[in-house]
């Protein structure tokens, strides 16, 4: 057997250390040996969110090729990507249409800014298409390079909005514990992750947090999921009253928590959050960086939960990760306030970058024209969710499956029926993640929750493979902790 593209050819070889087949790469793309790549990487590259000493001693796995939902490393091992990179490769790897869009735009207009009375066709066309795809009241978009920058931009927009409303005292932004809104200083402050805050003595002022709606880990034994979600939502009202309603600018939340564990609140949660925001005239911000562009089977995750935000943060699936780009969508009432009130003094060198905009435009057309989002809603999404629930029903260390569409988490637990978590849950999750990695599946750990978010083009047989590999890793974890 061989796997061949115009760039790389792999010839089948002996069994590899990671299982399956080990293929020998024979192309310029992998001209160095794995050992050489690792040595250079250790010598010069600081990785994100990594213990560099430990990583350099072990050596990074060098990824050299991707196609569809699969990756190949420098040793020729084929890996199925259960996380779409970092939640972003919605249309799958290797789409020639996106490469062609980037190439054409680089030849025509590789860069120009949108600062000083100038614009360009790609960003104009992208904005018009986003206005079609987003809910009816979203017709204006500000561009940046990532979700982190998008949430920084949200803060600038929120404060400018209230300045235009002659209510400058509205400075407080309420977020949630164990939320993730990026890793810039502002994004990290908005996020409620203690381990990030510990390394950030310089935090943004006037950001406060309420508890997350994590039923399995934090509900009382006599609470239903609906009662718990309602109680957690009502913490928002209590916090607004504590701060003074005239001092609160906005509430920000991911429709479902992504990096925090793919936590889906009960149906009582978001309607109550929206009711409270409207009652006190607090802007409601939906961080759609992970949930946007089809992940739940709806174009945007807030549509899955049935609420209407005032601002939405977009990234990841906007370009399927092929090039960096983020955006903030503004509800008409917010956009009109900015448009009618002079300068908005915020921007980035690459705001609305023409190549990124061209790739985003081509990517969104694929999602629309190939009906990828609809397929997630009616076919692969339900199949994925059912497959997970059937596979792990009654498993001795699985407490719950949470998710919708093509995003899910598997809660690891010492006593599933009693919702008793492992005392060393983070270690157990890391162990399970490593079993997945060694079994050539990318499955992420968030503490004791194992996360899956494959490309939206994943097929039913590929879902079967992902779930089978996940089951093998979780079985191995159960044996390792002495439960199976």
Model-derived segments and spans:
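Conserved N-terminal phosphate-binding loop of PLP-dependent enzymes in the Aspartate aminotransferase
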Residues: 3-14, 20-484
């Amino acid at each position: 057997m061989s796997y061949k593209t115009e760039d790389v050819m792999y010839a089948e070889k002996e069994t590899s250390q990671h299982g399956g087949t080990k293929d020998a790469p024979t192309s310029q793309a992998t001209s160095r040996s794995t050992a050489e790549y690792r040595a250079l990487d250790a010598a010069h590259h600081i990785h994100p969110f990594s213990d560099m000493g430990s990583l350099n001693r072990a050596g990074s796995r060098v990824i050299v090729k991707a196609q569809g939902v699969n990756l190949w490393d420098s040793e020729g091992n084929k890996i199925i990507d259960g996380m779409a990179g970092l939640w972003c490769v919605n249309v799958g790897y290797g789409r020639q249409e996106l490469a062609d869009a980037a190439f054409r735009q680089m030849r025509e207009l590789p860069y120009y800014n949108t600062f000083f009375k100038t614009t360009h066709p790609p960003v104009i066309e992208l904005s018009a298409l986003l206005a079609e795809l987003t809910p009816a009241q979203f017709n204006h978009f500000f561009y940046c390079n990532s979700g982190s920058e998008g949430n920084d931009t949200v803060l600038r927009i929120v404060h400018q909005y209230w300045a235009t409303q002659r209510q400058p005292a509205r400075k407080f932004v309420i977020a949630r514990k164990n939320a993730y809104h990026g890793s810039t200083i502002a994004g990290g402050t908005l996020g409620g992750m203690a381990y990030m805050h510990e390394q950030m003595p310089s935090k943004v002022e006037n950001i406060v947090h309420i508890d997350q709606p994590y039923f399995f880990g934090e509900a009382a034994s006599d609470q239903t999921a609906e009662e718990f979600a309602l109680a957690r939502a009502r913490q928002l009202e209590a916090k607004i009253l504590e701060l003074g309603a005239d001092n609160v600018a906005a509430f920000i939340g991911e429709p479902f928590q992504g990096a925090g564990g793919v936590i889906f609140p009960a149906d009582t949660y978001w309607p109550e959050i929206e009711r409270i925001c409207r009652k006190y005239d607090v802007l409601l911000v939906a961080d759609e960086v992970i949930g946007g562009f089809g992940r739940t089977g709806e174009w945007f995750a807030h549509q899955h939960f049935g609420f209407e935000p005032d601002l939405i943060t977009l990234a990841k699936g906007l370009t399927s990760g092929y090039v960096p780009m983020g955006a903030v969508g503004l509800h008409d009432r917010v956009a009109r306030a900015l448009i009618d009130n002079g300068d908005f003094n915020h921007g980035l060198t690459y705001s609305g970058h023409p190549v990124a905009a061209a790739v985003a435009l081509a990517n969104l057309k694929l999602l629309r024209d190939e009906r990828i989002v609809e397929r997630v809603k009616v076919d692969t999404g339900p199949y994925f969710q059912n497959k997970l629930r059937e596979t792990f029903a009654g498993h001795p260390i699985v407490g719950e499956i949470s998710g919708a569409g093509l995003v899910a988490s598997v809660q690891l637990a010492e006593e599933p029926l009693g919702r008793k978590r492992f005392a060393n849950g983070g270690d157990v999750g890391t162990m399970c993640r490593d079993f997945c990695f060694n079994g050539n599946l990318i499955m992420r750990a968030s503490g004791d929750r194992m996360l899956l978010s494959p490309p939206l083009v994943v097929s039913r047989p590929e879902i079967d493979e992902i779930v089978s590999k996940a089951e093998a890793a979780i079985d191995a974890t159960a044996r390792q902790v002495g439960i199976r």
